[in-house]
Amino acid sequence: MSKICQITGKKAMIGNNVSHSKRRTKRTFDVNLFTKKFYYVEQDCWISLNICANGLRVINKKGLDAALNEAVTKGYCDWKSIKIIG
């Protein structure tokens, strides 16, 4: 499973650790990703999504159906990658 948000498409970024003497070493900034279950009213089932904190805010603002449709049209996820729980 890749570390990409299924709603916003956010993924890890690469940057630098900077020490006190200003030496720079490469590091990755990971996304605040977690697995969350939602009740999908349109299909009358529970689904599981890998989303970041910003993705949860998008779902709270727009609604689950609108956020999923927008993510599918932008190519962040497809309907086959969404896990249907029951």
Swiss-Prot record:
Record flagged with keyword Transmembrane helix: no
GO MF, one example: structural constituent of ribosome
Cited Pfam families: Ribosomal_L28 (PF00830)
Family from the record: Belongs to the bacterial ribosomal protein bL28 family.
GO biological process: translation
Organism of this sequence: Phocaeicola vulgatus (strain ATCC 8482 / DSM 1447 / JCM 5826 / CCUG 4940 / NBRC 14291 / NCTC 11154) (Bacteroides vulgatus)
Mitochondrion in keyword set: no
InterPro entries reported for this sequence: Ribosomal_bL28 (IPR026569), Ribosomal_bL28/bL31-like_sf (IPR034704), Ribosomal_bL28_bact-type (IPR001383), Ribosomal_bL28_sf (IPR037147)
Annotated Gene3D superfamilies: Ribosomal protein L28/L24
UniProt keywords, alphabetically: Ribonucleoprotein, Ribosomal protein
Gene that produces this protein: rpmB
Name used for this protein in its record: Large ribosomal subunit protein bL28
Lineage: Bacteria, Pseudomonadati, Bacteroidota, Bacteroidia, Bacteroidales
Coiled coil spans: none
CC terms in the record's Gene Ontology section: ribonucleoprotein complex; ribosome
